[in-house]
């Protein structure tokens, strides 16, 4: 029987005890890409923050490889899951390579010393995101788009079984958006990594997703294959499009 990497059970999420979304049901297997879509403020980031343990569920449970999230130690979780968020991290005198190398720390000893193999993994992670040319630059001095690529490299460097990304295509030009999604697809297909990612671009979501979870303006949740979710009527309803329509041919709202 194939293992399930991420599964929710009667999940309710929100803030300060107030439920924002309830009855959230998802199931992600190794090698699958789940894309969360929906308008701003719908709750995509809130769901992701519960998966990565930044927030605690108000109700129900989240299971990672059959274990509740609260049963993992911090180090165990870091070896299992890597995360790319939209929030900017604070760094002091760190090069881009230093930031990427942080992805290896769950595997290091008490002193945090990297082995030769660790250093090779750092280099390979930088290469995958086309960032070897900026590895020695100060992380605080590079562009937002370059920072996003470095944060993806750090996540890759962790060698995760699950990767969670919150709007990773923000700040990227179209070339680097496509490159990023190609990397995620490669991780899913070749390494059997389970990918959970939120995206704004419906047309990109339709191309990369194995499954889609769409959170509507009215907090309704639709889950299914892209071909069943990305229909003119369903997307128009979920996004509350009253003066325009979703064009499934072009993957855009008009």
Which stretches of residues belong to each language-model region?
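Conserved ABC ATPase signature
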Residues: 138-142, 146
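Helix-to-loop junction immediately C-terminal to a conserved catalytic motif
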Residues: 52
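H-loop (His-switch) and adjacent beta-strand-loop-beta switch element
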Residues: 212-225
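Catalytic Walker B motif of ABC-type/P-loop ATPase nucleotide-binding domains
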Residues: 163-166
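The feature captures the beta-strand-to-loop junction immediately N-terminal to the Walker
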Residues: 37-39
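Conserved ABC transporter NBD signature motif
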Residues: 60-68, 77
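Conserved ABC ATPase "signature" region
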Residues: 101, 116-134
